[in-house]
């Protein structure tokens, strides 16, 4: 990538600006282009036939069931039930309301915001909810956010002394936030952003895990 930018600067006959370099770093990031996730893997000298991304896509390709759209936008759609909608006959002029039956399509979206939530739990989780809402609003011809869920996975929270399994390992020094701070602030942030858009956070899951064996420490971080 550095060689590419140097060649580009030579072609333009000038140094690239900070804005151009930072812009390139965003649009050419793994987050946007999946250069690793969708890249070619060569293991022990043998090129693998499928990328990690194509292997995940294969599930819906082999068993589409009620999938309407997947991996073509920033959100997936599945076929929903037939529903009645009470709405104006026309949207461009004053008109009577009517009840009309139509085939609904349900949007599904998962947004991971692990590192931002680790650094700043409230706003990290809030913008995670925001990204999920944004992508569903912009998917296809647009969809309406109705409800959200959240999953939190951290090391042991150590809320009290009555959980013997949490006391078997010494608590590590945390680089950014403690697990209990993440659980409390992230939950507040995800709910707060959803409420501002009329999307309540209605359910979710919470997992905590730590394990030490042969001087090796494992856990949700």
Segments the model singles out, each with a brief description of its role:
Residues 1-221:
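Core nucleic-acid recognition elements
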């Amino acid at each position: 990538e550095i060689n590419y930018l140097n060649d580009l600067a030579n072609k333009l006959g000038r140094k690239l600006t900070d804005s151009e370099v930072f812009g390139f770093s965003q649009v050419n990031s793994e987050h946007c282009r999946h250069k690793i996730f969708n890249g070619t893997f060569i293991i022990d000298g043998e090129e693998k036939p499928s990328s990690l991304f194509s292997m995940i896509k294969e599930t819906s390709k082999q068993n589409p069931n009620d999938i309407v759209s997947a991996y073509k936008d920033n959100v997936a759609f599945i076929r929903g039930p037939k529903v009645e909608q009470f709405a104006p006959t026309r949207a461009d002029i004053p008109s009577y309301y009517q009840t009309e039956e139509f085939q609904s399509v349900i949007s599904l979206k998962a947004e991971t915001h692990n590192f931002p939530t680790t650094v700043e739990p409230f706003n990290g989780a809030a913008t995670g909810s925001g990204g999920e809402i944004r992508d569903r609003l912009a998917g296809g011809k647009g969809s309406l956010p109705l409800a959200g869920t959240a999953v939190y996975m951290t090391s042991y929270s150590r809320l009290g002394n009555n959980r013997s399994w949490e006391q078997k390992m010494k608590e590590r020094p945390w680089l950014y936030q403690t697990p209990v701070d993440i659980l409390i602030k992230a939950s507040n942030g995800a709910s707060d952003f959803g409420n501002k858009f009329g999307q309540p956070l209605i359910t979710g899951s919470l997992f905590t895990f730590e394990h030490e064996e042969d001087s090796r420490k494992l856990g949700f971080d």
